[in-house]
Curated annotation (Swiss-Prot):
It is found in: Cell membrane. Residues 209-272 form the KH domain. One of its GO terms (cellular component) is plasma membrane. It comes from Levilactobacillus brevis (strain ATCC 367 / BCRC 12310 / CIP 105137 / JCM 1170 / LMG 11437 / NCIMB 947 / NCTC 947). Belongs to the RNase Y family. The chain crosses the membrane at residues 3-23. Coiled coil: none annotated. This is Ribonuclease Y 1. Residues 92-120 have a biased composition (Basic and acidic residues). Endoribonuclease that initiates mRNA decay. Its main location: membrane. Keywords: Cell membrane, Endonuclease, Hydrolase, Membrane, Nuclease, RNA-binding, Transmembrane, Transmembrane helix. Pfam families: HD, KH_1, RNase_Y_N.
Length: 519
């Protein structure tokens, strides 16, 4: 091989190596530039995402801040309302203490007047005794002067005559005192009763059997009725109350003899109107909420009544029953208002006679507690009240005050007599009671009681002013055939046990629901 060829080969190798180096360097630089560009894009994207995340975090923090502020403001409002309520209670308690202070002051003044009167009478008696002694001395001197009597004989004669004169005067004074005491006692008794009535004055409103619910517009009537009347039937079935929808503008009338049911229907209907969604499922939900809300309202009524009367440490169940009295009527009187009035009158009478005022008020408030219970048996409200007060460990004085309302049970304490007296005072004042309404409600209650006595009946409602009884039965115990027989049996029982005008329609309702959930 020649030298030039070797040199050319070496040169070619060197050129190839140098060219490959620079070619590789160029490719590496291009890759490096591409990597830098990609890194810059990633960095920019990361910055962008970081800015977005920062903004979202700031927005979320602001929302949390607003939400927390709203919760704090709501809690502050609730606390302010609670503080205001406590302040109102303290004000009421101060007013009660002021009234008691005035009563004690009047009683003290009365005792002072009696003391002054007794002191004057005592001075009068001492004066008359001195006059009698002076008369005896004068007679003794006269007898000794004109008669030949010894001193002992004269003394006996004078004493005998003085005794006769004093006995006559004493009898006259006793008769005058008895007559004065009789007149004073009668006047004091009248003043005491009038004072008790005035100091315990309570507004009495005769309950009716209807409640009016105001509508925002007349278009709401059609929504309440629903397609083919489904909504109104559902509401009537769940509450046992008649809904009367007529030409009265923007109003629906709820008719039923039970004020508790009417109140449930009213609350549920008002919630449905406010919500705007009226259909059977929503109606069931609102009726359940209304019942729960009414239970809370009943408890608050009982607590307010016991607080106003200064009665403490009463069993919570008894407090709820006291609240339920607001939805019971007796001879046209609101039972809670009547019981509060009786409690106040009993307290006033007990204070005048020196009895335990708090115990007297307690007995007066609970004297009709049996009317608040759901009567599932044939016991009278007096027997039921005795059982309830014994169950919740009330004083024997309270139990006897309830029992003494029955003629066959004697009052065993002064407080029991005072409760009976206060009950009569509250019941017999003009305009306090209405017997016709009481008898009407008793007939409706009897209709439901007859229906509920049959096996398989879940509950029943007397509606249409007693012209219809709707009986809801348990579908697992009453078949369609049994429902026909049950309606006939209830009809015959009503015909045998009740006197009523016109006809009574018996409607037996059997409803079967099958529910499955698709997952």
């Amino acid at each position: 091989m020649s030298v030039p060829i070797v040199i050319l080969a070496i040169i070619a190798i060197v050129v190839g190596v140098v060219g490959g180096y620079y070619l590789r360097k160029s490719v590496h630089e291009r890759k490096l530039d591409a990597a830098k560009y990609t890194a810059a894009g990633v960095l920019a994207e990361a910055k962008k995402q970081a800015e977005t995340a920062t903004k979202e975090a700031l927005l979320e923090a602001k929302e949390d801040s607003h939400k927390y502020r709203a919760e704090v403001e709501t809690e502050l409002k609730e606390r302010r309302a609670e503080v205001q309520k406590q302040e109102d209670r303290l004000i009421q308690r101060e007013e009660t203490l002021d009234r008691k202070d005035n009563s004690l002051e009047k009683r003290e003044n009365s005792l002072n007047r009696r003391d002054k009167k007794l002191s004057a009478e005592e001075q009068n008696l001492v004066k008359k005794q001195q006059q009698a002694d002076s008369l005896i001395e004068k007679r003794q001197a006269a007898v000794e002067a004109v008669a030949a009597l010894s001193q002992d004989d004269a003394r006996e004669l004078i004493i005998s005559e003085a005794k006769t004169a004093l006995a006559s005067e004493r009898a006259k004074m006793i008769k005058e005192s008895e007559e004065t005491a009789r007149k004073t006692a009668q006047a004091n008794a009248k003043d005491l009763i009038v004072s008790a009535i005035q100091r315990s004055a309570a507004d009495m409103v005769t309950e009716t059997t209807i409640t009016v619910v105001t509508l925002p517009n007349d278009d709401m009537k059609g929504r309440i009725i629903g397609r083919e009347g489904r909504n109104i039937r559902t509401l009537e079935t769940l509450t046992g109350i008649d809904l009367i929808i007529d030409d009265t503008p923007e109003a629906v009338v709820l008719s039923g003899f039970d004020p508790l049911r009417r109140e449930v229907a009213k609350i549920a209907l008002e919630k449905l109107i406010q919500d705007g969604r009226i259909h059977p499922a929503r109606i069931e939900e609102m009726v359940a909420k209304a019942k729960k809300e009414l239970d809370e309202h009943v408890r608050e009524l009982g607590e307010q009544a016991t607080f106003d009367l200064g009665i403490h440490s009463m069993h919570p169940e008894l407090v709820k029953l006291v609240g339920r009295l607001n939805f019971r009527i007796s001879h046209g009187q609101n039972a809670l208002a009547h019981s509060i009035e009786v409690a106040k009158i009993t307290g006033v009478l007990a204070a005048e006679l020196g009895e335990d005022v708090t115990l007297a008020k307690r007995a007066g408030l609970l004297h009709d507690i049996g009317r608040a219970a759901e009567h599932e048996d044939d016991n009278s409200y007096i027997t039921t009240g005795m059982e309830l007060t014994k169950k919740y460990r009330e004083s024997s004085v309270v139990v006897n005050a309830i029992a003494a309302q029955a003629e066959e049970t004697a009052a065993q304490s002064v407080i029991a007599e005072l409760v009976s007296t206060a009950d009569i005072i509250s019941a017999t004042r003009p305009g306090a009671r209405s017997d016709s309404l009481e008898s009407y409600i008793h007939r409706l209650d009897k209709l439901e009681t007859i229906a509920n006595e049959f096996d398989g009946v879940d509950h029943s409602f007397a509606i249409q002013a007693g012209r219809e009884v709707r009986v809801i039965v348990r579908p697992d115990r009453i078949s369609d055939t049994d429902a026909v027989v049950l309606a006939r049996d209830i009809k015959q029982q009503i015909e045998g046990d009740l006197d009523y005008p016109g006809h009574v329609k018996v409607s037996v309702i059997r409803e079967v629901r099958s529910v499955e959930y698709a997952k």
